[in-house]
């Protein structure tokens, strides 16, 4: 606990994804007072053409009450 899933468009390098995972892990540890061993981070690439149907509608619009940071689009 916790497990964080980041959905993003393809095209980011492995180095960028590893850095993002590291920074998310640090933020979770500092904010929630969890150990590094308790944090897991996954990345799921979603094509831009599929974003609306696979991410925006089911996970953003349909679950607005669970969002702590909404997108600006």
PLM regions: where:
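A domain-level signal for the structural core that forms small-molecule/cofactor-binding pockets
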Residues: 2-73
């Amino acid at each position: 606990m916790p497990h964080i899933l980041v959905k993003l468009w393809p095209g980011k390098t492995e180095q960028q994804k590893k850095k993002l995972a590291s920074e998310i892990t640090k933020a979770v540890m500092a904010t929630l007072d969890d150990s590094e061993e308790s944090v897991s981070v996954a990345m799921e690439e979603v094509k831009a053409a599929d974003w609306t149907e696979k991410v925006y509608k089911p996970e953003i619009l349909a679950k607005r009450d669970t969002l702590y940071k909404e997108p600006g689009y």
